């Protein structure tokens, strides 16, 4: 499935945001992680039964407006504006990693606009016994070791990566990473843990059993903090269960979304 690509402008052109969308049915908004926005077979499968809308974070890829977002709260307000602009007053939110953190913040601070909440290996909490590494200092060639259960497997070769011989490609990848990392650190100070009790939407948490970036212990922490949340651990997957164990992850998420 080839998604539609549009650019949305907000605040008199201060934001110019790339949005991918496909499918029909109840809306599901997908918020991507630090690796950037890519349409993959997982989103294809979700779009088979829903209207999937996937906006790119400001400053990532081809999207502009990062300079108008100072902190995480600014980002949450921005996403509420974007949903209003897209005429999506109530949606299901599907977020991966950093996108999961943002989705959880939206569900906690604007519970009336979230129908269901599906979080795949979200960040946002901190456990001293399982510190999350700062990937800004990790060489690109070592990323598969952190995010894949099998860093030598075929998926490692397919992971999107900048062309080391192309300065523009390297710059865009660095900007995408920087546009997201600025909202993450210092992670313990963001305060999500004290807001998760406000989530009212039915919540699904999906975690790779071999996640070396965000330890599966965080799945238990999120499940304990969000009322009624359900945790599904996918064996044989790391931080990208929707890609590494796509069939099982897709089945769990599509069953939850209905």
Annotate each predicted stretch with a short phrase.
Residues 210-214:
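Acidic catalytic loop of the alpha/beta-hydrolase fold
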Residues 229-258:
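Catalytic active-site module of serine/aspartate enzymes centered on a nucleophile-bearing elbow/loop
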Residues 95, 99, 103:
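Gly/Ala-rich beta-loop-alpha elbow adjacent to hydrolase catalytic centers
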Residues 2-4, 165-194, 198:
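Hydrophobic, aromatic-rich cap/lid helix
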Residues 12-13, 53-94, 243, 251:
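Active-site loop/oxyanion-hole signature of alpha/beta-hydrolase fold enzymes
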Residues 199, 205-207:
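Short beta-strand/loop motif that positions the catalytic acidic residue
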Residues 104-109, 115-146:
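Flexible "cap/lid" loop of the alpha/beta hydrolase fold
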Residues 12-62:
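Conserved HGGG/HGGXW glycine-rich cap/lid loop of the alpha/beta-hydrolase fold
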């Amino acid at each position: 499935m080839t998604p539609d690509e549009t650019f949305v402008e907000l605040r008199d052109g201060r934001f110019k945001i790339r949005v991918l969308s496909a499918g029909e049915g109840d809306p599901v908004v997908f918020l991507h992680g630090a690796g950037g926005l890519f349409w993959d077979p997982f989103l294809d499968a979700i779009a088979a039964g829903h209207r999937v809308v996937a906006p790119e974070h400001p400053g990532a890829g081809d999207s502009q407006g990062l300079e108008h977002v100072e902190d995480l709260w600014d980002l949450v307000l921005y996403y509420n504006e974007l949903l209003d602009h897209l005429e999506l007053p109530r949606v299901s939110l599907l977020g991966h990693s950093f996108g999961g953190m943002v989705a959880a913040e939206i569900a906690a601070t604007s519970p009336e606009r979230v129908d269901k909440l599906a979080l795949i290996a979200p960040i946002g909490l901190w456990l001293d016994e399982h510190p999350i590494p700062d990937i800004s200092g990790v060489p690109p060639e070592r990323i598969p070791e952190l995010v894949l259960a099998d860093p030598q497997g075929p998926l490692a070769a397919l992971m999107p990566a900048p062309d080391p011989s192309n300065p523009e490609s390297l710059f865009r990848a660095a900007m995408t990473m920087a546009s997201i990392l600025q909202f993450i650190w210092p992670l313990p100070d963001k305060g999500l843990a004290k807001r998760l009790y406000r989530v009212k939407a039915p919540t699904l948490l999906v975690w790779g059993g071999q996640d070396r970036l965000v330890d599966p212990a965080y799945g238990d922490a999120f499940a304990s903090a969000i009322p009624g949340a359900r945790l599904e651990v996918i064996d044989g997957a790391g931080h990208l269960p929707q890609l590494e164990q796509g069939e099982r992850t897709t089945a769990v998420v599509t069953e939850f979304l209905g």
